[in-house]
């Protein structure tokens, strides 16, 4: 794109009252999964971040515009190895996401070459504008309804597996336990996540969890926001630590306990803002949620959703799971 074309595109947006692509977008990515795209205008350039199904929110490689079309690029590195496993060459494959806008909706196409150099993939998908965040709620004025116990300590009544993976969940001595056993010499077996049959809007949630060494799980609020549950005791703070909103919000302090000890969560979700108290320490204080996290059931932040706990990684234990809905 020439400087003249870029200037013309910028002028066109200015004449229309600003660039309509700027903001946050809930994506329904190829295959029906949940994604997110955030576009910003910085001083002299555009920037963006993207979530593509699972994993973390990551920066894109570039964002640029040509008239009424937005182009977002991502780069994937592919290592070429010889028979001994030594890396002989690293290729960078660029994926282009091309977007057209109509009101509050995006029509997108992703284009990328195959890693073997033969052919081009072209897949269409959609996005919907996420409305601006409301003001930070005054939690002192929020009213909660009666508490409901989600786990009865006896069986899995009120819960069900997500998808068709194997079930590692059971109840042992009043504890909700996940044991994703892998048999030596056999192919890896995929285990499922467990969700409530009921769905919720905003709420306060309290529970206890106990981790073993290296354990990794997560608590999904409304099925879309993951509160990280992981063995991170003694690790430097980042947005993947115990109690973080996965890849989005870093705890303000480390409050996790060593493995083997019961740990408490007190989580409040109101008006797309979240507060997390871990082991009595407020580590996230009424912070905004810009969009879903990796592993979300869908990208829509306004749809009621279940509580779900992650069981597809490692073993984990939960107990005393209690929810109080917000009364509007």
Residue ranges and their predicted role:
Residues 15-328:
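Carbohydrate-interacting regions of secretory-pathway proteins
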Residues 1-9:
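Bacterial N-terminal signal peptides
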Residues 10-14:
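Sec/Tat signal peptide C-region and signal peptidase I cleavage site
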């Amino acid at each position: 794109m020439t400087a003249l074309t870029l200037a013309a595109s910028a002028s066109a947006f200015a004449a229309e009252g600003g660039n309509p692509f700027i903001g946050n977008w809930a994506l329904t990515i190829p295959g029906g999964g949940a994604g997110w795209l955030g576009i910003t205008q910085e001083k002299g350039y555009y920037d963006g971040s993207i979530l593509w199904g699972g994993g973390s929110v990551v920066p894109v490689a570039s964002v640029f515009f040509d008239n009424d079309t937005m182009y977002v690029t991502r780069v994937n590195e592919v290592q070429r190895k010889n028979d001994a496993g030594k890396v002989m060459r690293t290729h960078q494959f660029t994926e282009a996401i091309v977007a057209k806008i109509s009101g509050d909706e995006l029509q997108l196409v992703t284009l990328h070459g195959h890693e073997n150099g033969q052919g081009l993939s072209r897949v269409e998908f959609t996005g919907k504008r996420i409305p601006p965040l409301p003001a930070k709620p005054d939690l002192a004025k929020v009213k909660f309804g009666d508490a409901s116990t989600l786990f009865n300590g006896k069986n899995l009544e009120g819960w069900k597996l997500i998808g068709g993976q194997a079930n590692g969940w059971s109840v042992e001595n009043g504890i909700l336990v996940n044991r994703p056993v892998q048999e030596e010499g056999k192919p890896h077996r995929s285990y499922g996540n467990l969700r409530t049959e009921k769905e919720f809007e905003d709420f306060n949630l309290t529970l206890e969890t106990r981790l073993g060494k290296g354990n990794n799980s997560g608590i999904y609020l409304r099925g879309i926001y993951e509160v990280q549950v992981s063995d991170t005791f003694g690790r430097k703070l980042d947005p993947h630590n115990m109690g973080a909103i996965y890849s989005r919000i870093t705890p303000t302090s480390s409050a996790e306990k060593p493995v083997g000890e019961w740990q408490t969560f007190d989580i409040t979700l109101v008006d797309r803002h979240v507060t997390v108290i871990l082991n009595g320490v407020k580590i996230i204080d009424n912070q905004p949620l810009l969009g879903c996290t990796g592993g979300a059931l869908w990208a829509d932040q306004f749809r009621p959703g279940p509580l779900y706990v992650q069981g597809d990684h490692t073993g984990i234990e939960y107990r005393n799971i209690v929810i109080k809905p917000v009364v509007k």
